[in-house]
Amino acid sequence: MRPFKLMGHERSLTQVKYNQEGDLLFSVAKDSSASVWFASNGERLGTFEGHMGTIWSIDVDSNTHYAVTGSADLTIKLWLVETGECVYTYEMPTPVRRVVFSPDNSKLLSVTDQVMGQVGTISVFDVNNEEPKNQSSKPSLVIPTRDGAKKVTIAGWSAGGKYIIAGHEDGLVSKYDGATGEFIDSVQAHGIHNEEKIHLVTDIQFAPEDKSYFITSSKDKCSCLIDVETLEIMKVYKADAPMNTAAITPLKDFVILGGGQEARNVTTTAESQGKFEARFYHKIFIDEIGRVKGHFGPLNTIAVHPDGTGYASGGEDGFIRLHSFDKSYYDFEYDAERTERAIAAGTT
């Protein structure tokens, strides 16, 4: 599994994201430009220039027509992927931590920070796909932080945009109606599996096949697999370092976790000391089955290729590593899985 090492950012990576076809990889970092790469060979296709601060998040619509970025400069920018032109800028009251297109590309979700006396909010904007330069600056839906709840740190859409799933600073995961913003339910997903004091939810990524469940990561060194409809915690994956990101793989029943000790807490730069590896767990049996080294700092973001043929990781070290899975990855099976497959083959 020899990766491409992509060097295009001057500072730590904050998010990497594949387009739906998987031929392009988008990346943002604590510098002020976004990059677009060919996923097949790691060649840089171009950049989106215009932000004045850290870009925390990026997303691309299902047609690879528009990309959107959210920044610490208090703006969200809408870009034409083909030309790199910024066609619209949304002015926000506080830094933007997350931006996500709805599954049908008709809406844009953002998570803004709870700073400068402002209440952290989830805002939803209607996207004018026909006239990209004529967007509404006012959100069609605003979900403020609930009374008694900690601020939202991450959010995303369930299948069909039916629900908005949000992660909070205290390890809570909440579910809201995607159309009305009405609060439906919540579950304490983190801060209950060990004695860790910091429970902040750092990532939410949905199952690639149907978005009927999702995975979280947290500073409490755990990751949870949660059902969208019931918010049942189905699986818990325990690591030995704070986790910044987690993803679910298609094709194989695996999940990938990434994180590591923060640089100021590590006495040497050795990756084993800081636990700077991507960790692979079996999705069903929850065992850790392998690690991939390479970064010289915590992994901040992981995205799995839509075809399940590889993954990309972005680190605190400023590098993106683009991995393609080899034969041993596809061949790995537990005895129980092999037996089940053999029985199924014998009955068809």
UniProtKB/Swiss-Prot annotation:
Keywords: Cytoplasm, Initiation factor, Protein biosynthesis, Repeat, WD repeat. PROSITE patterns: WD_REPEATS_2 (PS50082), WD_REPEATS_REGION (PS50294). Signal peptide: none annotated. WD repeats lie at residues 8-49, 51-91, 93-135, 147-186, 196-238, 294-333. It is found in: Cytoplasm. Pfam families: EIF3I. InterPro entries: eIF3i (IPR027525), WD40/YVTN_repeat-like_dom_sf (IPR015943), WD40_repeat_dom_sf (IPR036322), WD40_rpt (IPR001680). The keyword Protein biosynthesis applies. One of its GO terms (cellular component) is nuclear periphery. One of its GO terms (molecular function) is RNA binding. Coiled coil: none annotated. One of its GO terms (biological process) is formation of cytoplasmic translation initiation complex. The keyword Cytoplasm applies. HAMAP family: eIF3i. Component of the eukaryotic translation initiation factor 3 (eIF-3) complex, which is involved in protein synthesis of a specialized repertoire of mRNAs and, together with other initiation factors, stimulates binding of mRNA and methionyl-tRNAi to the 40S ribosome. The eIF-3 complex specifically targets and initiates translation of a subset of mRNAs involved in cell proliferation. Component of the eukaryotic translation initiation factor 3 (eIF-3) complex. Belongs to the eIF-3 subunit I family. This is Eukaryotic translation initiation factor 3 subunit I. The gene is TIF34.
